C-alpha cells in the first residue's frame, strides 16, 4: 500500500477554517506524494468550505500529488457533495484504505 499523508478535517469546513486546512494539507503534501483528505469528522460545510476543498484539491493536482477523499456514505460532507453533484468531479471513498488505493 502507498505511504500516504492523511489529513483529518474535523469540525467545520467554512470561511473561518479553510486557511487552516489549506496550511495543514500543504504541510502534509510536503512530506508525501500522496495525500488523503478524511472528511469523516466534518460536521459543517458551507459554500466557502466547498470552494476551499476544491482549491486544495486543485493545488495538490497542480503539484503533481496523488490524492484521495474519504467521505463516508452517511456523513454530512458526503450528503452535501452529492447534492451539489461534486462526486462527478472527485471520487468520494468510504475508507482511508480505499482512498489510498484510489490515489495510487
Language-model-derived ranges and their functions:
Residues 15-90:
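Amphipathic alpha-helical interaction surfaces in cytosolic regulatory modules
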Amino acid at each position: 500500500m502507498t505511504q500516504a499523508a492523511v489529513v483529518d478535517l474535523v469540525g467545520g469546513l467554512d470561511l473561518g477554517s479553510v486557511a487552516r486546512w489549506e496550511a495543514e494539507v500543504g504541510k502534509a503534501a510536503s512530506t508525501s506524494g500522496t495525500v488523503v483528505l478524511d472528511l469523516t469528522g466534518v460536521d459543517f460545510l458551507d459554500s466557502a468550505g466547498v470552494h476551499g476543498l476544491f482549491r486544495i484539491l486543485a493545488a495538490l493536482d497542480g503539484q503533481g500529488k496523488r490524492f484521495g477523499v474519504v467521505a463516508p456514505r452517511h456523513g454530512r460532507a458526503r450528503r452535501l457533495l452529492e447534492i451539489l453533484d461534486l462526486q462527478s468531479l472527485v471520487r468520494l471513498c468510504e475508507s482511508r484504505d480505499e482512498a489510498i488505493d484510489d490515489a495510487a
